[in-house]
Each structure stands twice: as C-alpha cells, then as structure tokens.
C-alpha cells in the first residue's frame, strides 16, 4: 500500500488492479489491429459504459490520444488517454493523462484464435471512499471489460478477412 500524508493524517491508497480475459475467434495480428486502430475499429466494440469517444491525435497505435467518458457504478468520469505499444503487435497501453490509471490490452495467439486480456491498474482512494472503491470497482469494471471483450469477439467474427 502507498501511504500519503494529508493534513497531518495518513491516507492509505491501495494499488488497484482489475482484469478480464476472453478468447476471440480471430488471429492475434487481426485482433491487435482492431484494438490498436482507434479511428476505424476500436470504437465499434466499446460497450455502452463508454460514451463520447473521439481521437484527438494519431489514430493507430503509439502516440494516439483519445478522449471519452466512462460510466461505472453510477459515476461518470472523463478520460484522456495516451496510447503506447510496449510490445507492438502484442501489448498496447492507454495511460490516463489526468490520473494514475493505465489500461493494458494483451493479445496472445492461441492457434487460429487469440486470448485477449484487458487490465487496468491505478492508485485507489484512501479512507471510506477507498473502502467502497475496493469493494465495488473490481466487480463493476470486470463486467464492463467482459462486455467489451465479447463485443470484440463478435466484431472480429463479423469482420473476418475473406
């Protein structure tokens, strides 16, 4: 846990991590292209929890900057994400420019299909708010990511290269 001082009190902030994984019926290179292309593909498999998705600069892979709102657990928050590709073709990250949140998409080949994992890590809140965050955020985000992954699988099946 991370400990920060605030007005002579200590506030403990836990590192939060939420992940979901799903098999996608398409080759890893195709799936990664869908994930990395923020203009032509990625917006088409975002679940309803995401709104107002737009690309501010770039569009495909590293250097792309996106902005969107996400509603989770009754709260809506705006994100401005910068995309990086620590392992191009396999791992793509989105780092929020206004917080510690980092979402990682990992695409691994499995025969003619792929295993896709979405994980988000961030510094959780302290105090009573942090307690509720630790109780509810993982369940809510995991459900959103499971929906996104199912939509990605359906999108990949629908747009299967001929």
Where does each model-flagged region fall?
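Residue-level detector of alpha-helix boundaries and kinks
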Residues: 16, 27, 68, 92, ...
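Beta-strand elements of well-folded, non-transmembrane domains
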Residues: 24, 72-74, 122-126
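Beta-strand/loop substructures that line and gate deep hydrophobic ligand-binding cavities in soluble
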Residues: 95-147
């Amino acid at each position: 846990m991370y400990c920060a001082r605030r007005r002579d009190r200590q506030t403990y902030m836990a590192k939060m991590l939420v992940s979901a994984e799903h098999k996608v019926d398409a080759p890893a290179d195709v799936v990664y292209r869908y994930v990395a292309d923020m203009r032509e593909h990625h917006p088409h498999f975002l679940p309803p929890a995401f709104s107002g998705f737009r690309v501010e600069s770039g569009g495909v892979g590293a250097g792309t900057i996106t902005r969107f709102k996400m509603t989770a657990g009754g709260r809506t928050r705006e994100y401005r994400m910068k995309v990086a590709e620590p392992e191009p073709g396999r791992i793509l990250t989105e780092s929020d420019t206004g917080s510690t949140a980092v979402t990682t998409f990992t695409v691994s080949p499995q025969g003619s299909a792929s295993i896709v994992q979405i994980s988000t890590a961030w510094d959780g809140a302290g105090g009573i708010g942090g307690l509720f965050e630790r109780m509810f955020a993982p369940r809510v985000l995991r459900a959103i990511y499971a929906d996104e992954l199912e939509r990605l699988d359906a999108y990949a099946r629908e747009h299967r290269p001929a």
